[in-house]
């Protein structure tokens, strides 16, 4: 089962509001989903994106793939940058630990 983090459209006609959900890739756009991770209001101004960052990171660690639109929203919210920095720091720390033992 391929799991994606994607948008689910809600709201009135011509006034969209999107939920950011985790869903099976074969499920319909507005159909079944596994979990709601947040919401996005395109006409919302500054607080247009509201996310549960811990749950987003959990699903990314499990292997869920964000769609292109959700990836750009995660980038705007700063979640992907924080995730990248944490992974880079862990990789550098592992390399620093492995380097001295290899020289000695």
Swiss-Prot record:
Gene3D superfamilies: 3.30.1320.10. It comes from Gemmatimonas aurantiaca (strain DSM 14586 / JCM 11422 / NBRC 100505 / T-27). GO terms for cellular component: cytoplasm; small ribosomal subunit. It holds the Pfam family Ribosomal_S16. PANTHER family: 30S RIBOSOMAL PROTEIN S16, SMALL RIBOSOMAL SUBUNIT PROTEIN BS16M. This is Small ribosomal subunit protein bS16. The keyword Nucleotide-binding does not apply. InterPro entries: Ribosomal_bS16 (IPR000307), Ribosomal_bS16_dom_sf (IPR023803). The gene is rpsP. Belongs to the bacterial ribosomal protein bS16 family. GO terms for biological process: translation. One of its GO terms (molecular function) is structural constituent of ribosome. HAMAP family: Ribosomal_bS16 (MF_00385). Keywords: Ribonucleoprotein, Ribosomal protein.
């Amino acid at each position: 089962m391929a799991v994606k983090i994607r948008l689910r459209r809600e709201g009135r006609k011509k006034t969209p509001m999107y939920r950011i959900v985790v869903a099976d890739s074969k499920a319909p756009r507005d159909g079944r989903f596994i979990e709601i991770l947040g919401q996005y209001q395109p006409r919302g101004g500054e607080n247009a994106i509201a996310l549960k960052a811990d749950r987003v990171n959990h699903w990314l660690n499990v292997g869920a793939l964000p769609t292109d639109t959700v990836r750009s929203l995660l980038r705007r919210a700063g979640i992907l940058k924080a995730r990248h920095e944490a992974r880079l720091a862990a990789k550098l720390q592992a390399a620093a630990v492995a380097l001295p033992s290899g020289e000695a």
